[in-house]
Amino acid sequence: MREIMFRGQTRRHGKKVNMRGDKLPGRWVYGGVLQGPGDFSIIYGGENLGDIEKHTVYTDTIGQYTGRDVKTGKVFEGDIGKSRDGIFLVVWNENNSAHMLQFYDPPAELLYLEEMWDDSEIIGNIHDNPELIGGGQDDA
């Protein structure tokens, strides 16, 4: 049976600062998901049924586990990867009802996730590292 899991971010990357003024990374939580009506949803999980933890996350940061693992860990929607053929983003494609690889460097057609090479690695994600695929940096 395929493992069903999601991840979501409890705060925006770099938005909250600590006492010294340093930016903090966004905190990722993993588990099941309850879709909220607005900007927020709930990620829940725990080791035991009696110990279920609930975390409010930004809905637009939720990504599903693809069922694929690489040497750097589990692969989720929104991950940015690197392979011998370039830099890619893991996306859900509605037309094909499948997780796919959208290449940015160099630009190319979408490839099915199953075509991911064994030497591929995850180097970031669209929320924490948009600059890896040409996205803007948020200095706030």
Show which residues each predicted segment covers.
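Secondary-structure transition motif
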Residues: 1-140
